[in-house]
Amino acid sequence: MDKNIQVETVVNKLKNIAEKKIKDQKYNTALAAISCAADILYTFNQKYTDDDLEKLTSDIGDNLKSKYNRANYKKCTDTILVYDGFGLDTRGVVRMYLNALGLNEYSVYYVTNSTVQDSIPTIKSMCDKYGIKIIYIDMADYEKCFMQLSDVFETIKPKAAFFYTTPYDSAASAAFHAYEGICTRYLIDLTDHAFWLGKCANDYFLGSREMSAYIEHFERNIPKHKCIKLGVNLLNEKVTDHSGLPFDLENTRYVFSGGALYKTLGDDNNTFYRIIDHILEEHSDIKFIYAGTGDNSELKKVVEKFPDRAFHLNERKDFFYIIQHCTLYLNTYPMFGGMMMKYSALAHKL
């Protein structure tokens, strides 16, 4: 069976499950089915949006919001909610937003997963610096996540909320949808190049490049006035811990690349890895580092072929140090990296 048809078949089955469970008021299972369908669409990336999934998510938000009395909800003029569905200390985008909001002296509440309490020291330090309050919620259970996030909205009554999360965060999408017309909601379009869920949950969509707006409007059918280009102020924090690096970066010639590994896959000619292979074959004094996570099936072949010269590292806080000392930064292909390319330009390594 054709892969596209297989994906459509599985996604339709999950939609049917979600629809049935919504009728049965089994919202946890319905949200799980929606999340699974969105994850599949993100992984195979055959389209950028799915109105059926958005409608199902909206229905859940509408049904569950009846548990809250909104008669006394008044916007708090200086309070901002920042929802982070990742909870990753190595991701720069959320720290850029927190830094900007903190510098402008907003009253900010940062909401993230309860499982990351002990693994986000950099974010905690920034929150302490600006007096940003951190709230942890249980994201392991879909309905509980919806309820706890809604409780945060009800408690702090934010004027605006930022939606920064995975492409398949059904619970948060439903919760944000429930506050339509009450709170101004902004989706940070981190995954501007692929499918994501949350169109129903936000008023405005913040992209950092022209491609973001093009796909938002022409592929996701978002009205132009809702598409906002908001550049990022790169955080260039000095990191002194360089432990775990495979060699002395300051005295070695090497090519560096990084980001989510799926951005290097899907090209019939395997161009990205052919370039790496050619460089290492032709230049015996050059090494290669890739920093990032995901499907490493192709990268593993390079590492095995050049065991002392090609290295795969996890996401690192000192990635800018690695960029600064590389001989060449190689962008990912066929999907270009956005933030990494900005940092490579800052380091004059393009």
Over which residues does each language-model region extend?
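Conserved catalytic-core segment of nucleotide-activated headgroup transferases in glycan assembly
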Residues: 90-100, 217-308, 312
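Acidic donor-binding loop of glycosyltransferase active sites
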Residues: 156-161, 324-336, 349
